[in-house]
């Protein structure tokens, strides 16, 4: 099944938490990366089947837009069928740390 990577960058921690929560509850995806980007921006990345990542990203974006926490979406992107070079270089590979949560 073709895989995809979805990334959301937000301003503020509560917003990225809301996005991650909605994405994981909204589809069969795995959280593969989370970190502080810069100046109060946070980034979260998911992986899973293309259709599930598309659905989960919509849910995550909606959660940030609907939250009353004052956060905002800085950027977001979906990479359907990422090439091996992307997976080798960016920190979005399935790791041992997330293996038990993989759907």
UniProtKB/Swiss-Prot annotation:
GO terms for cellular component: carboxysome. Disulfide bonds: none annotated. Keywords: Bacterial microcompartment, Carbon dioxide fixation, Carboxysome, Photosynthesis. GO terms for biological process: carbon fixation; photosynthesis. Gene3D superfamilies: 3.30.70.1710. It comes from the Bacteria. PROSITE patterns: BMC_1, BMC_2. One of its GO terms (molecular function) is structural constituent of carboxysome shell. It is found in: Carboxysome. InterPro entries: Bact_microcomp_CS (IPR020808), BMC_dom (IPR000249), BMC_shell (IPR050575), CcmK (IPR046380), CcmK-like_sf (IPR037233), CcmK/CsoS1_BMC (IPR044872). Residues 4-91 form the BMC domain. Forms mixed heterohexamers with CcmK4, probably with 1:5 CcmK3:CcmK4 stoichiometry. Only very weak interactions with CcmK1 and CcmK2 were seen. Bulky residues in the pore region probably preclude the formation of homohexamers by this subunit. Belongs to the bacterial microcompartments protein family. CcmK subfamily. A probably minor shell protein component of the carboxysome, a polyhedral inclusion where RuBisCO (ribulose bisphosphate carboxylase, rbcL-rbcS) is sequestered. This subunit probably does not form homohexamers. This is Carboxysome shell protein CcmK3. It comes from Synechocystis sp. (strain ATCC 27184 / PCC 6803 / Kazusa).
């Amino acid at each position: 099944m073709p895989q995809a990577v979805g990334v959301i960058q937000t301003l503020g921690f509560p917003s990225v938490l809301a996005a991650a929560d909605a994405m994981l509850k909204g589809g069969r995806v795995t959280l593969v990366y989370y970190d502080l980007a810069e100046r109060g921006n946070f980034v979260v990345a998911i992986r899973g089947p293309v259709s599930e990542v598309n659905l989960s990203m919509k849910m995550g974006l909606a959660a940030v837009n609907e939250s009353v926490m004052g956060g905002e979406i800085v950027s977001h992107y979906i990479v359907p069928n990422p090439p091996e070079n992307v997976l080798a270089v960016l920190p979005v590979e399935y790791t041992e740390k997330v293996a038990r949560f993989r759907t």
